[in-house]
Amino acid sequence: MEHIFIINPSAGQGKAVKLIPKIRKALEGTTYAYSIYTTKAAGDAERFVRETCEAGKEVRFYICGGDGSLHEAVNGAKGFPQAEFGLMPVGTGNDFMRNFGKKQDFMDILSQVEGDSVPCDVIDINGRYVVNMANIGFDCEVAAQVGKWKQKPFIRGPVAYLIGVAAEFAKPMGRRMSFRWTDGTTMAGRFLLCTLANGCFCGGGFCSSPKAALNDGLMDVGIVKMIPRKKFIGILPKYKTGTYLDTKLAAERVLYEKYRKLELAVAEPANISIDGEISQFTYLKAEMVPSAFRFIIPKGLEDGAE
């Protein structure tokens, strides 16, 4: 088996590139066959993984980047559910790995190579695999702000997220959305935000979907009705810790359920954040794909997926 480390040179303001000498130092002189591939542009990781899988090679991929890099790579392995992916989280948010442990748990190279893998679901949204989460509305607009602020020196993920929240509070909030469930029932109205979650975390550690599991075959759908700004500010600390669902405000204003499929439409093109990357949509169909890929748990780390 070959162990392929995929380096995203733009991830984490260049932190991924700094891993190259550490990878070589850890694996040279061992019996592990390995190689290092540095991506050349957006979408290159997806192409590289797809071509490698189609060639029938027995490999493991280790993504040196963030959630966006993992998103690309897993999309390259569509149709290859036995493809194995490790993650060395040097991106901005690094939310996917939070479902299993802390960042330092994933930074030891030998522990990654010697780790076992577990099956993980994905959400298929209009033909694209979502590894962690899709956000629409307030959360998505904050993510767009984070994308701007994270380019600034000394501003890290959680700080950038809080700045993004403050910036969005100054704008008109809410968007009209129309939902259709698998039983044919519909719901329409003006909502603050909607999350379609495979994992629990977004925004660099905000536990927006505390009941989510990566292997239950279900997406956690959170729909937040319009909330006055003052009340929303008050609930933010509990939104970060994942305890907001226990509040009276959530009982009145939050719809939180698990689904296998749903459809969502908006009247005008709207932003959607998919694994932290921003695009636009007017209609989407979301459907769970169970056990779509395998995720490597570093040796010695308790398996958080089970």
What are these model-derived regions, one by one?
Residues 181-183, 188, 213, 223-306:
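ATP/nucleoside-binding phosphotransfer catalytic cores, i.e., glycine-rich phosphate-binding loops
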Residues 9, 64-66, 90:
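Glycine-rich beta-strand-to-loop/alpha-helix junction loops that act as flexible
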Residues 1-61, 107, 302, 306:
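ATP/NTP phosphate-donor binding region
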Residues 139, 195-209, 278:
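Glycine-rich phosphate/pyrophosphate-binding beta-alpha loops
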Residues 173-175, 190-192, 215-220, 260-262:
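A generic structural signal for short beta-strands and their flanking turns/coil linkers
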Residues 79-192:
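Catalytic core of DAGKc-family lipid kinases
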Residues 150-160, 204, 210-231:
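Gly/Ser/Thr-rich active-site loops/lids in small-molecule metabolic enzymes
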Residues 69-80:
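Short Gly/Thr/Asp-enriched flexible loops that form oxyanion-binding sites at enzyme active sites
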